[in-house]
Amino acid sequence: MRQVCSLLFFCLISLGVAAQDNASSQQCAPDGIAVGGFDLVSYHQASGPLPGDTGFAHQIGELTYLFSSADNLQTFLSDQQRYLPTYQGFCAATLAMGRLACPDYSNFKIENGRLLLFELAGFTNGRSLWNSDPVGFRQRADANFQTLVK
């Protein structure tokens, strides 16, 4: 019975991963507004994430990033790579586990100066999982990102 359950679990995970081929951060932004409309620069400030304003917007590809002020927009434009979310905005912890999930944009961590976003669903807190083994989760997420997203 245990072998059957393990095989079934593996098959379900494999199907989920296969269905995510050619994934893009667009799937977490069906309306084209990235990061749930939150200001990327504000994640790095004491205030924490602030809602962006359409008056301070910047487009990258098909995604529009909103900022809460002209100053934050200019800060972003001066160093975009610093402020763009790691793993194109997918949940870092679930990516480490081999699947893609859209995060809860209020569940985040700044690690080594980079924004990590995490799922928060029911009893699953991606940030807590990540914090239990940040080095291991980072290694697995980096490896999975190469195959699942890029």
Regions found by a protein language model. Give the residues of each.
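Compositionally biased, low-structure terminal segments
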Residues: 10-11, 77, 84, 146
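Mature extracytoplasmic domains of secretory-pathway proteins
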Residues: 66-68, 72-85
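Sec-dependent N-terminal signal peptides
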Residues: 4-13
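N-terminal signal peptide c-region/cleavage motif recognized by signal peptidases
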Residues: 14-18
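Intrinsically disordered, low-complexity terminal tails and linkers in eukaryotic proteins, enriched
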Residues: 20-61, 82-150
